[in-house]
Amino acid sequence: MATKFPAFNQGLAQDPTTRRIWYGIATAHDFESHDGMTEEKLYQKLFSTHFGHLAIIALWVAGNLFHIAWQGNFEQFVLDPTHVRPIAHAIWDPHFGSGITEAMTQAGADGPVNIAYSGLYHWWYTIGMRTNEQLFQASIFMSILACWTLFAGWLHLQPKFRPSLAWFKNNESRLNHHLAVLFGFSSIAWTGHLVHVAIPESRGIHVGWDNWLTVLPHPAGLTPFFTLNWGAYAQNPDSLEQVFGTAEGAGTAIFTFLGGLHPQSEALWLTDIAHHHIAIGTVFIIAGHMYRNTFGIGHSLKEITEAHNTRHPLDPHKGSFGINHDGLYETVTNSLHFQLGLALAALGVATSLVAQHMGALPSYAFIARDYTTQSALYTHHQYIAMFLMVGAFAHGAIFFVRDYDPELNKDNVLARVLGTKEALISHLSWVTMILGFHTLGIYVHNDVVVAFGNPEKQILIEPVFAQFVQAAQGKMMYGFNALLSDPTSAASVAANSLPGNHYWMDLINRQDALSAFLPIGPADFLVHHAIALGLHTTALILIKGALDARGTKLIPDKKDLGYAFPCDGPGRGGTCDSSSWDAMYLAMFWALNLIAWVTFYWHWKHLAIWQGNVAQFNESGTYLMGWFRDYLWLNSAQLINGYNPFGVNSLSVWAWMFLFGHLVWATGFMFLISWRGYWQELIETLVWAHQRTPIANLVGWRDKPVALSIVQARLVGLAHFTIGNILTFGAFVIASTSGKFG
């Protein structure tokens, strides 16, 4: 008999119903639950999947490079980066009539093309690429890299090349390798590229394979390095009049501390970026020599964690926190879910910071003036951050169900957190209620008084504390005279005593959207608290799901039921919606809600500044109808008109996606609201009809059709809700911004 899917779970493969297909898909990547899985095999399989992941990334990068080199307009963009709209790729579509063909033939192309809003053109331009040939070469290199990493993944599954479990659990060596080699060396290597290729290109000096060994990146060569005269590398920076990409106004410095933006490219100074990378690379290389290596040199992580407790004779909290970090070393070492949770949380925070800083401190030349790209990149990175953060809590909960050992962690910080979960959860609950009632109350009050013609009766609160923080960083307009905004303060005196010119105060006090700190008022105050509500509610649901994963008063044996379980069986009334999986599922809706508010805020505030109409956000952002009418409705107008009875324009694809996104989103509710019985009856009706329909009934199947379980239907519903939500808002952001600014 042929092997039935899933091959990795023979118990499931014997299931006579369609359930085996869905459970097979659900557990395909849950290696821990597969037949014959050992801890060593689990680590080896995961290690190999990392190489597969790298191959996919390399292939994706190669595809972007190849299509832009083949069908894009990179060389034209290089000649005039502020006016040439970058092309992502050509479109060949049999559905296109003459109207849409004409509308999509744009940016100087011969036929229909898509415009690129990825920022790739700006990045490649900034790092010194200038020709299509260079893009093709990079594409070939990335394709070879993809093949190489795929081979590495396959190789490490072969018996001779499988690393041992002890190798995977050698924490100190892994940390040293990741810190010094992966982070440290790659940062230094990137500095090398910036200094040897990107900075010369930004000054009109071409460096290629033909001359890179003969063009000195700095007139003094390595002499200042070996004579410890490192300051020489910071002397003679580019002038404020430098024309990016040319020798006009160019200097010779390679590592600077100028601060602010290059006046023409409106991006961070490349020499500042190079300085950042060499500094951080050096720090990481030092950090990579911190932990105990094979020769016994360095610190033991176990000793560090166990010394970090309240039994130290000089500790003022002696004994009051239990035994703090004892047992944590073994717990983290032996739990992949704990490690993954930590990694996802760290990467989630970093990704959200990337979103913020790509707008506040743009690092790529001329990208700050490509408003659609800036909006798309902000939105993209915030949504990615949301998924990573929810994933962090999900794996934290799985850790508590599958990997947590109460004996090993007795009275340490993990046990203490579990022991005080009621206080943690109730405080978070209280915070969300305070935030929710007050914020909504003020918004609704303002709506009512505006609706009745008394806008002057709105409750408008100046964000004085946030304004003070901005003033401390040097924002002059509020008149606070604090730290950097007070020329006589110790901070200002210290800043002014640094040798050379510095431009961060100019950046902070700019009058346009590129100011590092945009002016804030009552509308910002309100939306800040709405976002705080979203953050705290999402956190509440996720933290409760993780802390309650092992058991609650209602279900004391929850840990035995696993991470996801339905309302399961007799005598279990009222146990629906109580698995940790349910918490993750519910938190996703709040997280999507939250990221919508975050991106609405960023996008509308920037649209208003870019259009020279700051008052629109400041005045309409203080009541809900202002948001609905002057942001959502007003900016949907062009979108809805992408195609109409009178013809189409280049926004039509986004108009269609906006419509389709709403459809996908709404489909989610069909799965979310109706429960199992409905689907079972529907399926049985369809099967009955199929079996009685001539010709159709020639097709049969062996599996008995069984409806989706509650958990499965929720997953299908959540997937549609999420994808529809993102499709809708993505189309909205791109079309509403590009419709205004081209």
UniProtKB/Swiss-Prot annotation:
[4Fe-4S] cluster binds at residues 567, 576. PROSITE patterns: PHOTOSYSTEM_I_PSAAB. Signal peptide: none annotated. SUPFAM superfamilies: Photosystem I subunits PsaA/PsaB (SSF81558). PSI electron transfer chain: 5 divinyl chlorophyll a, 1 divinyl chlorophyll a', 2 phylloquinones and 3 4Fe-4S clusters. PSI core antenna: 90 divinyl chlorophyll a, 22 carotenoids, 3 phospholipids and 1 galactolipid. P700 is a divinyl chlorophyll a/divinyl chlorophyll a' dimer, A0 is one or more divinyl chlorophyll a, A1 is one or both phylloquinones and FX is a shared 4Fe-4S iron-sulfur center. InterPro entries: PSI_PsaA/B (IPR001280), PSI_PsaA/B_CS (IPR020586), PSI_PsaA/B_sf (IPR036408), PSI_PsaB (IPR006244). HAMAP family: PSI_PsaB. This is Photosystem I P700 chlorophyll a apoprotein A2. The lineage of its organism: Bacteria, Bacillati, Cyanobacteriota, Cyanophyceae, Synechococcales.
